[in-house]
């Protein structure tokens, strides 16, 4: 998974105030609940030395996701009186948190972006026209990147036409779907239709290129709404289909990692090996097992590659005034700063020393 969405947070210096809070709308009086949550977090930040201008910038953003229904959260980052990044979270944080650190505490946000699968969702159904008893074919479709699109959906497109004209209309819809798939590099098309509408599905899929047809996954029409306010089209069906998968790039990198580990186990897994690779700019990607179990903190210097387990180790970089920072923040800064990627895998699928593995850009024969 590429981490370029975090670039704005490294474009200007900290310290950064990072807030993760539950902003779910599936409770009674959510505005009051969010206000109370924010009040506690604001007090915590104030106690950590956050200035009033930065607190004000965060206050303006808290709860601004009112158009998103259901369970979700927010991740907010601000420094020097300016909001640096605000994102909705598909899952509310297990516990609200507020930290004021030199390096932005972004690992919880990065983990919610995974597995970052590009897709196109299609809902295909029949409906009776309002003016007569003639049936219409109704198509809704939308691209996205799972799972962040659950709460930050892309534009939705719609097509309604007479069922008798479907063979001709399906050609145009298939053309639009293929263009959308190519534009977004979608790896799968999740198509929902009723069992009795197999003909509608067949006509549509047969108009897609053969290379695209093999990426179509058909799911039954459960009768659930195609989407809630501010939510992704076919969210429930996408969750069932994509929650246990990874994107194609991450799958390829994981296979490469397994081959590397078989040849060079000592430099391929464990926190120490990963830190060494990050110090050298040698890491192509970092693998973390879920749930993530990094230490509470690491030592950091002013540059992304200044990352160590112990403070004296910073001296080799000429750094004599290092600081302890949240381990996840230091690791992700090193990944972004060296152009490395992040992959998360369930612990039961891949056992790694310290829950950490590193795929190297090159192997140093002297290590």
Locate each region found by the language model.
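Terminal alpha-helical anchor/extension segments at protein ends
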Residues: 1-367
């Amino acid at each position: 998974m590429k981490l370029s969405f975090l670039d704005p947070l490294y474009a200007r210096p900290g310290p950064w105030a990072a807030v993760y809070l539950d902003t779910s709308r599936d409770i009674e009086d959510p505005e009051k609940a969010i206000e109370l949550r924010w009040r506690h977090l604001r007090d915590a930040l104030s106690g950590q030395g956050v200035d009033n201008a930065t607190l004000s910038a965060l206050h303006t953003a808290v709860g601004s996701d009112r158009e998103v229904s259901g369970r979700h959260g927010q991740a907010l980052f601000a420094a020097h009186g300016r909001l640096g990044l605000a994102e909705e979270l598909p899952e509310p944080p297990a516990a609200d948190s507020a930290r004021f650190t030199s390096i932005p505490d972004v690992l919880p946000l990065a983990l919610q972006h995974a597995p970052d699968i590009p897709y196109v969702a299609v809902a295909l159904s029949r409906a009776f026209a309002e003016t007569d008893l003639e049936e219409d074919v109704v198509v809704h479709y939308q691209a996205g990147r799972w799972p962040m699109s659950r709460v930050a959906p892309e534009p939705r497109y719609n097509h309604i036409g007479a069922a008798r004209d479907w063979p001709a209309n399906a050609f145009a819809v298939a053309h639009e779907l293929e263009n959308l798939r190519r534009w977004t590099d979608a790896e799968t098309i999740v198509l929902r239709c009723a069992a009795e509408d197999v003909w509608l599905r067949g006509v549509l899929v047969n108009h897609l290129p053969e290379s695209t047809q093999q990426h179509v996954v058909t799911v039954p029409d459960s009768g659930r709404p195609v989407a809630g306010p501010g939510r992704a089209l076919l969210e429930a069906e996408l969750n069932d289909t994509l929650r246990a998968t990874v994107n194609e790039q991450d799958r390829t990198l994981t296979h490469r990692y397994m081959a590397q580990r078989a040849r060079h186990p000592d430099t391929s897994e464990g926190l120490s090996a990963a830190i060494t690779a990050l110090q050298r700019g040698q890491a192509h990607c970092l693998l973390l097992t879920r749930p993530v179990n990094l230490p509470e903190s690491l030592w950091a210097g002013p540059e992304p590659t200044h990352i160590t387990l112990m403070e004296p180790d910073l001296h080799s970089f000429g750094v004599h005034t290092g600081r302890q920072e949240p381990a996840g923040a230091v690791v992700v800064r090193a990944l972004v700063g060296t152009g490395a990627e992040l992959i998360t895998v369930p612990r039961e699928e891949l056992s790694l020393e310290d829950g950490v593995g590193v795929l190297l850009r090159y192997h140093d024969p002297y290590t």
